[in-house]
């Protein structure tokens, strides 16, 4: 299966640094049949990034509102996202859930606004360290996915990318063990299999949690890991490109 490598730039960068980053990423060579690339800049730089990257590199937004239009100061709608030429959308990132109190219902409502457009939604799920230690991992992940799996058709679900991000491993330098990553991805795939076996086999489940060049080969080689959602390492073109190179090599072996 084609690997999907995505960079979440979060609230980082300025016009100068982003131009340098785009220039660096534009240099990486990879087989587009084996690897797909996407980046998520801050919304004010999306148009700049689209114009500065090769067409083969997808560009997405980090968040939208679930309203269509109207008096919602500061918000961005799904229609606007499509209008400016975005390819991807992050939904439910752990920082949105923890810092802005986004609920599973909010995540579903945002997904519902985007699911029938040309934009690929990347739905983020993950557990806290307390959840894992108390044995609630499976319960938490199943709950986070329940509204989505119960209310979308198989055809709609097939458009979704799922990003598993253990909250305790994001931005901390702590990485889940390979066994933990594989077991969790396998569990997520088993939830999807209850809906449809073919869906479970073909849907992309990517890992996000301190993934970097030094551990990319091991993580991306796991059988149920279809790519990565990279944070800090995606802000350095050389490191992000090395992760892309590792993914490309894995898919050619």
Curated annotation (Swiss-Prot):
A GO CC annotation given for this chain: cytosol
Pathway assigned to this chain's UniProt record: Carbohydrate biosynthesis; gluconeogenesis; Carbohydrate degradation; glycolysis; D-glyceraldehyde 3-phosphate from glycerone phosphate: step 1/1
Residues at the catalytic site: 93 (electrophile), 165 (proton acceptor)
Reaction it catalyzes: D-glyceraldehyde 3-phosphate = dihydroxyacetone phosphate
Keywords, in A-Z order: Cytoplasm, Gluconeogenesis, Glycolysis, Isomerase
Any one GO molecular-function label of the UniProt entry: triose-phosphate isomerase activity
One biological process term in Gene Ontology: glycerol catabolic process
Cellular location(s): Cytoplasm
EC number of this enzyme: 5.3.1.1
Main location: cytoplasm
InterPro entries membership: Aldolase_TIM, TIM_sf, TrioseP_Isoase_bac/euk, Triosephosphate_isomerase, Triosephosphate_isomerase_AS
Pfam family, one: TIM
HAMAP family: TIM_B
Function: Involved in the gluconeogenesis. Catalyzes stereospecifically the conversion of dihydroxyacetone phosphate (DHAP) to D-glyceraldehyde-3-phosphate (G3P).
PANTHER family recorded: TRIOSEPHOSPHATE ISOMERASE
Subunit structure: Homodimer.
Protein name from the UniProt record: Triosephosphate isomerase
Organism of this sequence: Francisella tularensis subsp. holarctica (strain LVS)
Gene name of the record: tpiA
């Amino acid at each position: 299966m084609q690997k999907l490598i995505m960079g979440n730039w979060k609230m980082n960068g300025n016009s100068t640094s982003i131009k340098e980053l785009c220039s660096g990423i534009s240099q990486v060579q990879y087989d587009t049949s084996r690897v797909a690339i996407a980046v998520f800049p801050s919304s004010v730089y999306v148009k700049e990034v689209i114009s500065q990257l090769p067409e083969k590199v997808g560009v997405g937004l980090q968040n939208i509102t679930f309203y269509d239009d109207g008096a919602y100061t500061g918000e961005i709608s799904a229609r606007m996202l499509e209008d400016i030429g975005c390819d991807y959308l992050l939904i439910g990132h752990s920082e949105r859930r923890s810092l802005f109190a986004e609920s599973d219902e909010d995540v579903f409502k945002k997904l519902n606004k985007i699911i029938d457009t040309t934009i690929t939604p990347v739905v983020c799920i993950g557990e806290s360290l307390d959840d894992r230690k108390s044995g609630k991992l499976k319960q938490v992940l199943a709950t986070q996915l329940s509204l989505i799996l119960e209310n979308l058709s198989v055809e709609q679900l097939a458009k979704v990318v799922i990003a598993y991000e253990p909250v305790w491993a994001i931005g901390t330098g702590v990485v889940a063990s390979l066994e933990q990553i594989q077991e969790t991805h396998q569990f997520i795939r088993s939830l999807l299999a209850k809906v449809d076996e073919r869906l479970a086999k073909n849907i992309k489940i990517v890992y996000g949690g301190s993934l970097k060049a030094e551990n990319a080969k091991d993580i991306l080689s796991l059988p149920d890991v279809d790519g990565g959602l990279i944070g800090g390492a995606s802000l350095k073109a050389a490191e992000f490109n090395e992760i892309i190179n590792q993914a490309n090599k894995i898919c050619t072996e």
